[in-house]
């Protein structure tokens, strides 16, 4: 895993272009502390930069930017192409292989481009953001992996086309204009992340997963082509449903999982795994251990608050599997130490509070390994979120309630303080108040968007009108089951723009590579073939995943209410984080940048402090925006 950046401008002096691209690379040093490189074509105004975290082929033969054997292509690769050995064999069998100088996946990638053109990306199985300059055709290609594991931004800074793994690299270009896109800000306030293709800056976009962006420097235009899409996977899968039994499906799934994990264990550096003790991470850990002749290094974190502490469950799974397990207990002080860095770590507003423990467990793992596997993606592919199996029941209940009674019922539920619900069950207050807010939904899709949305029109910045393309249900596949529609939305938006963005920035800030075997595209396509009943049934998700897991780990070590990977944010905002949050939520601070109306925010802050409501998600969204605005300034 590394950092890529660069630009295409008018022809300029070699030294001028080199200085500019080195400055951009400097912003990505955390992504690649082991090496740096640049390639410049002054006559055509091209500058390509790279920061390297050495994982495969640690020798100088793995240095980037790398030039293909014929000299036609110059490329940088952030991420991994896991099937590179298979591609190398295919190239050799077809007489298409050059004399390889090393054994890196980047060199195989370039040979594939020479043999099959840029469309070779459809043969790659991996997580990647790729920049390729075609010297013969004078075209720049930017490629993002199928699921959006690796980030990639691009756009124009004046007359110069710029791109990079993170926005902070683009900001270093001398021509960059850091104007906030109010439409992107509106979407952020709704979802607490900026959905693709938006970025927080005007004129800068996120490359969509599964796409190739082609720049024509002469016309100063870009064209986007799709080489894979979750939409096509969903359509194909639901048309060709798996016809066997659940037991047969579990064996086919297990074979795919084992291969996905096997190819992700290839590295020339130490490798480990994040283990929370839940279904997904326990399954990845179990299959890693099955593939390993020595104890796998596993890592987990815990909390003093029992409602959030999964560490004992992770430790029990680790003992059963015989891993080399390391655990860290997170205290309020640890969170306070991380928070000041979040504005720069996430270089656009981002407010998933699990960003804190994700970074802490990444930093813990980095003391021992350079690569760590995770269980991310299991919830979205196999129906793990509570909202999937509760959503349908909730909407049926809402639909039976006379429309005229719903507002009053919502107000009644909302008036009961969150702390009173929490006496019955941890975190019940947060969920009860969310139910109170969705009682106005007209259909289950609208209810779902209400469930995953936060700030509404009262807090949106003026002159903002955008709707994210992913929200255009007319473009969605025709999925009859509303639960599958929820899962589809999560796969195309929440997964890449929240979960994977969180993991990428949190791990890369610690110079750790994270790999997600459950997001192997073969598993995604297989998951869409499975009937929903093999994923969600009788109030429980991930049924077929559990069936595989219980061949390796006893059921009693796993079965418990789902916690999620979070922190006790609501309580911390009333307690140890209050002194930090208060100045950021003052009326003066909220007016400082001219983007927010303090009134609804101050009202929620006061209600939260009084314990009447649990507004932790809403408030964290504003706090992270404020932290980011201050860091960006």
Regions found by a protein language model. Give the residues of each.
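Adenosyl-5′-phosphate
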Residues: 1-4, 42, 96, 119, ...
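Cysteine-centered catalytic environments shared across enzyme families
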Residues: 1-346, 358, 362, 551-557, ...
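Generic hydrophobic alpha-helical membrane-span motif
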Residues: 38, 151-154, 283-286, 381, ...
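Compositionally biased, low-complexity linear motifs
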Residues: 43-48, 160-164, 390-399, 530-539
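Short, basic, helix/turn surface patches
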Residues: 131, 349-361, 401-407, 587, ...
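Active-site adenylate/phosphate-handling loop in enzymes that bind or generate adenylated species
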Residues: 146, 360-420, 477, 494, ...
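Glycine-rich loop motifs involved in handling phospho/adenylate chemistry
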Residues: 271-280, 305-306, 353-356, 381, ...
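Short low-complexity, flexible loop/linker segments enriched in glycine and/or proline
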Residues: 340-344, 366, 387-390, 572-574
